[in-house]
């Protein structure tokens, strides 16, 4: 049987996806390499909704260690923020960075990042887009972080089985990684309650031997920012897990 006309297109798209995954992993290593100094502002996005421009190579030459000794002394903690597209990952990062929300849903084509200083360490949060072509690469980043935040749209009953499947893959990848599951959009009509989400995500029986937390949140584009109670609780829990 002769090959279908779509065959070459599928192969080309597959190759492009593989290249994208490799680039994402290289950027991750360059951006979040432990002990390496960066020169981007807090909350700057690389490939996300805020900007489509990558920093030029001559903009991130290594800093002189004597110029910023205090920054060099701070340890780094890495948090990976994942979830299906539309679950609220980008809005969550914008709130933590103190940026105003963006109206409507703007999908992340690549990743966004935020660096937040604390008294004893700096927290780097990396969001990878939740579209189907990017989910394949999620597992490559799990072993590089200290905590996983998994965002779930509490109103998206149709795709909840997909979210459960992706979450299970990540949990299997690193059995010891602390996981914070954020049940987002709890303020909307039709949102599943916490008991329903525990059942649908398989949390009641599967993960008794590891640190898995399920928190309710209402991280909406029109929300009140970092002062939103759900966001504050998530941040406090992250600090406890990272300390």
Swiss-Prot record:
InterPro entries: ARL10 (IPR042951), P-loop_NTPase (IPR027417), Small_GTPase_ARF/SAR (IPR006689). SUPFAM superfamilies: P-loop containing nucleoside triphosphate hydrolases. Signal peptide: none annotated. GTP binds at residues 83-90, 127-131, 184-187. Keywords: GTP-binding, Nucleotide-binding. GO terms for molecular function: GTP binding; GTPase activity. Belongs to the small GTPase superfamily. Arf family. This is ADP-ribosylation factor-like protein 10. It comes from Mus musculus.
């Amino acid at each position: 049987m002769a090959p279908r006309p779509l065959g070459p297109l599928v192969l080309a798209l597959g190759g492009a996806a593989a290249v994208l995954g490799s680039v994402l992993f290289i950027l991750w290593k360059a951006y979040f390499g432990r002990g390496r100094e960066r020169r981007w502002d807090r909350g700057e996005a690389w490939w996300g909704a805020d900007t489509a421009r990558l920093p030029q190579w001559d903009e991130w030459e290594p800093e002189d260690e004597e110029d910023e000794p205090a920054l060099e002394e701070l340890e780094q903690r890495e948090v990976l923020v994942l979830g299906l597209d539309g679950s609220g990952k980008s809005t969550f990062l914008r709130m933590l960075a103190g940026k105003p929300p963006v109206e409507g849903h703007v999908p992340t084509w690549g990743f966004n990042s935020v660096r937040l200083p604390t008294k004893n360490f700096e927290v780097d949060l990396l969001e990878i887009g939740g579209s189907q072509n990017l989910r394949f690469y999620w597992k490559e980043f799990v072993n590089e972080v200290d905590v996983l935040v998994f965002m779930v749209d509490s109103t998206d009953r149709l795709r909840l089985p997909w979210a459960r499947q992706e979450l299970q893959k990540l949990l299997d990848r690193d059995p010891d990684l602390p996981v914070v599951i954020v049940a987002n959009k709890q303020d909307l009509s039709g949102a599943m309650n916490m008991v329903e989400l525990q059942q649908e995500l398989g949390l009641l029986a599967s993960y008794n031997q590891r640190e898995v937390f399920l928190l309710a949140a209402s991280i909406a584009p029109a929300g009140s920012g970092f002062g939103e109670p759900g966001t504050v609780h998530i941040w406090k829990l992250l600090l406890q897990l990272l300390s």
